[in-house]
Regions:
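Short, acidic loop-to-helix structural element flanking the phosphoryl-transfer center
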Residues: 56-84, 94, 120
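Short, small-residue-biased leader/transition segments that mark boundaries at the very start
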Residues: 1-2
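Asp-based, Mg2+/Mn2+-dependent phosphohydrolase catalytic module
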Residues: 90, 94-183
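Helix-loop "lid/cap" segments that line or gate small-molecule binding pockets
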Residues: 5-7, 26-40, 96
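Metal-dependent phosphoesterase signature
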Residues: 32-70
């Protein structure tokens, strides 16, 4: 893939632990954390190349899904409108949804790669665009919690994900959403 072809100013691909440590960050923040010795221009050039490789792979192979994800999405979508807000590139969400044929469960989605806006602004944008009355943002990082708070939306911590969060209700398995979001 990208690092197999050689990137002269990078010693090698980031480790799994390093990648997990930057999940949910904006492109600028994650590249600065992974490669502090590179310029901002080089960060974005490298990030764009990584996104191209990632999106191609994702569309063809998909990703690792949480247990009972599709069954839970199907049940939830019959009771509630579902949406996605992410700090990903513009093509990531469509690639992921295409790979797993999950489009039918989501009414709308937004990301920083499409709008250039911060996650909290995109949460607010989706809430306003879809006239949501009682939204809840489910996320797995402190950055998600902060974004939900800034957007004025209640936050539910997905403790099975990548980050640690304090002071928020949590679920430890994806299907628990069915119980919590009943009414």
């Amino acid at each position: 893939m990208l690092f197999r072809s050689g990137v002269p100013d990078i010693e090698g691909p980031p480790t799994r632990a390093q990648l997990e440590g930057v999940m949910g960050m904006t492109a600028e923040d994650l590249m600065a954390k992974l490669y502090p010795h590179l310029s901002k221009e080089r960060h974005m050039e490298l990030f764009d190349r990584c996104c191209q490789v990632e999106n191609t792979y994702l569309r063809e192979h998909g990703g690792v899904l949480y247990p009972q994800l599709e069954e839970t999405l199907e049940a939830l979508s019959q009771k509630l409108p579902l949406f996605i807000v992410s700090n990903c590139n513009a093509e990531y969400i469509p690639c992921f949804l295409d790979a797993h044929q999950l489009h039918r469960y989501f009414r709308d989605w937004e990301c920083i790669g499409r709008t250039g806006k911060q996650k909290w602004e995109n949460i607010r944008l989706v809430v306003e665009r879809n006239h949501l009355q009682r939204p809840v943002y489910v996320g797995d990082t402190a950055m998600d919690q902060e974004a939900a708070q800034k957007a004025g939306v209640p936050f539910l911590h997905a403790a099975y994900g990548f980050g640690d969060v304090t002071g928020a209700p949590e679920i430890t398995q994806f299907p628990q959403l069915l119980e919590l979001l009943q009414d």
